[in-house]
Amino acid sequence: MASRGKSETSKLRQNMEEQLDRLMQQLQDLEECREDLEEEEYEETKKETLEQLSEFNDSLKKLMSGNMTLVDELGGMQLAIQAAISQAFKTPEVIRLFAKKQPGQLRTRLAEMDRDVMVGKLSRDVFTQQKVEILTALRKLGEKLTTEDEAFLAANASATLSHFEKVTASLGSEDKIMALASSGVGKTQT
């Protein structure tokens, strides 16, 4: 009986991760194709995707309140969704790696970005934004940042990222996290 519960939990987690991956990929594809879309079509598609993320977040909240064995596994996904909804992170790839708790891949992405900015393949503005997102994600995953990274983060963190960081610092306060997600959804719909 217990093994069946583990199997079902594993399958549910896999389905949830696949759903999150699909939504994050949809956001990433949308950003990559932005130039090919009319502004209205882009905004409508983004709004629909954020609504789907919000619905997915609501489902996660219900699952977390009803099944305590899933709390740890789903908590990371929920934080990633809230980051996307609040638009604290603008890079879907960073959100995906954060949700899957993959600090090694985040650090690899950071190294690739350092190289890309040096050879002129990546603009300084995009580099700064994505580096701040990655460093914030690493900090949220409990990774130790260098003094240099901490200084970079302090100098470049946006108000949205700072707000996300402050609210999620008290993970015990699910109401605050949900308030952040709700305010992010409200801002994107207006």
UniProtKB/Swiss-Prot annotation:
Protein name: Protein LZIC
Subunit: Does not interact with CTNNB1.
InterPro entries listed in its UniProt record: ICAT_dom, ICAT_sf, LZIC
GO molecular function: beta-catenin binding
UniProt family annotation: Belongs to the CTNNBIP1 family.
GO terms under biological process: cell differentiation; central nervous system development
Keywords per UniProt: Coiled coil, Developmental protein, Differentiation, Neurogenesis
Name of the gene this protein is made from: lzic
Organism: Danio rerio
